[in-house]
């Protein structure tokens, strides 16, 4: 969701609460739980899951390996669920022409630097830069070049924008900020 007026442009950034992250976390949780149950079934010699008879899977080495994969999968799944619940990467970009200030806010991982807040003057913005890498995995990222601070990404690297969409977004932002566009 974006909000735009003559003097203020606010762009909300979705973080890790995407449908694909929910799907991957859920699939990984169920799969790793299945692996762990099969490994435990082979150790106990009982059927904890009725789909796989435990007599067919020997505990050493198959049961140990399946238990290890199950535990590793549960750790990765819990990491994904934590990033989803903390909504890591979400935030907003606020461009205020009236005040002449740009604010970029993102949520990070819990700790001392959970809130990432960048604030600088519009006069320090040198340009809006589009970085394009074509190939098997094309990547198009929009950056804001700041004097003395380098380039700050405005779009996520996994956001697959078409060339037309990234050009339009860059043109609108450059027009709003009254800065040039660079393409790399």
Swiss-Prot record:
UniProt keyword Transcription regulation present: no
Keywords attached to this entry: Chloroplast, Membrane, Photosynthesis, Plastid, Thylakoid, Transmembrane, Transmembrane helix
Subcellular location: Plastid, Chloroplast thylakoid membrane
Transmembrane regions listed in the UniProt entry: 22-42, 57-77
Protein's membrane topology: Multi-pass membrane protein
Location (main, coarse): plastid
Database matches in Pfam families: Ycf4 (PF02392)
Protein origin, superkingdom: Eukaryota
Cellular component, GO annotation: chloroplast thylakoid membrane; photosystem I
Gene Ontology annotations of biological process type: photosynthesis
NCBIfam families (alphabetical): PRK02542.1
Stated role: Seems to be required for the assembly of the photosystem I complex.
Family, per entry: Belongs to the Ycf4 family.
Alphabetical list of PANTHER family matching this protein: PHOTOSYSTEM I ASSEMBLY PROTEIN YCF4 (PTHR33288:SF4), PTHR33288
The protein's name in its UniProt record: Photosystem I assembly protein Ycf4
Organism: Platanus occidentalis
């Amino acid at each position: 969701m974006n909000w735009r007026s003559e003097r203020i442009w606010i762009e909300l950034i979705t973080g890790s609460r995407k449908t694909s992250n929910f799907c991957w976390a859920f699939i990984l949780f169920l799969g790793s739980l299945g692996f762990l149950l099969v490994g435990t079934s082979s150790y106990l010699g009982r059927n904890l899951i009725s789909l796989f008879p435990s007599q067919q899977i020997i505990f050493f080495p198959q049961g140990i390996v399946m238990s290890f994969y199950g535990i590793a999968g549960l750790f990765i799944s819990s990491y994904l669920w934590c990033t989803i619940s903390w909504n890591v990467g979400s935030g907003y970009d606020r461009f205020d022409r009236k005040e002449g200030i740009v604010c970029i806010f993102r949520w990070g991982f819990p700790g001392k630097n959970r809130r990432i807040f960048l604030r600088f003057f519009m006069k320090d913005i040198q340009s809006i830069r589009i970085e394009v890498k074509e190939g098997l995995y094309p990547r198009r990222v929009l950056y804001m070049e700041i004097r003395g601070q380098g380039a700050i990404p405005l779009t996520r690297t996994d956001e697959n924008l078409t060339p037309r969409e990234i050009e339009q977004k860059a043109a609108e932002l450059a027009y709003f900020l009254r800065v040039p566009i660079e393409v790399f």
